[in-house]
Amino acid sequence: MKIFLDTAKIDEIKKGVEWGIVDGVTTNPTLVSKAGTPFKETIKQICEIVQGPVSAEVVSSDWQGMVEEARNLAKIDEHVVIKIPMTPDGLKAVKILSTEGIKTNVTLVFSANQSLLAAKAGASYVSPFVGRMDDIANDGMRMVEEIITIYSNYGFETEIIVASIRHPRHVLEAALMGADIATVPFAVLEKMFYHPMTDLGIERFLRDWEKYKAGR
């Protein structure tokens, strides 16, 4: 499974790339606004760091505006993927962009039905929001499981990006189900490194090594 970082912070992206575990980045207007730099400049900087897909979201609500924004964003770098909201106008834009070879990521997906429509419209990626589904007492990962089954049944090439991830368990479940990608906040990615038994093992090895050196 590929791991994307869900952030627009350059320092976090650099760390993830240095660790050798980041395959791409997803952003949204909220994340970019927190980065404190102009939108296009931020996306360009990210593309210079990550040699993989970088999702940049449109802000227009009508299909004409989405298509125009998407064409401009796609000029920034060949790795830019256009995030489009899951709406009728959004899917109309996705269909047009797919015929032009511009990759799209349909976002704000909350059902397998929506994912089916996104795939039929030609989306390159679809982003089901598992954490937000959990927030309203629904099973977000069950939705992902349904999407995987539908895509497998009909051979859709749309890749599934498990989004709105809140904790390492979401990442683990996504991997066990066979999702293509998990887009992970930096804080969650950091938590994935650690286990108390690992820390105890390191401490023991260091103590034993110090005893060995002292006895020589």
UniProtKB/Swiss-Prot annotation:
SUPFAM superfamilies according to UniProt: Aldolase
Gene3D superfamilies linked: Aldolase class I (3.20.20.70)
List of catalytic residues: 83
Catalytic reaction(s) noted: D-sedoheptulose 7-phosphate + D-glyceraldehyde 3-phosphate = D-erythrose 4-phosphate + beta-D-fructose 6-phosphate
Pathway terms, separated by semicolons: Carbohydrate degradation; pentose phosphate pathway; D-glyceraldehyde 3-phosphate and beta-D-fructose 6-phosphate from D-ribose 5-phosphate and D-xylulose 5-phosphate (non-oxidative stage): step 2/3
Superkingdom classification of source: Bacteria
Keywords from the named record: Cytoplasm, Pentose shunt, Schiff base, Transferase
NAD in keyword set: no
EC number: 2.2.1.2
Biological role stated in the UniProt entry: Transaldolase is important for the balance of metabolites in the pentose-phosphate pathway.
PANTHER family linked: FRUCTOSE-6-PHOSPHATE ALDOLASE 1-RELATED, TRANSALDOLASE
Protein name: Probable transaldolase
Organism, scientific name: Thermosipho melanesiensis (strain DSM 12029 / CIP 104789 / BI429)
Organism ancestry: Bacteria, Thermotogati, Thermotogota, Thermotogae, Thermotogales
Gene field: tal
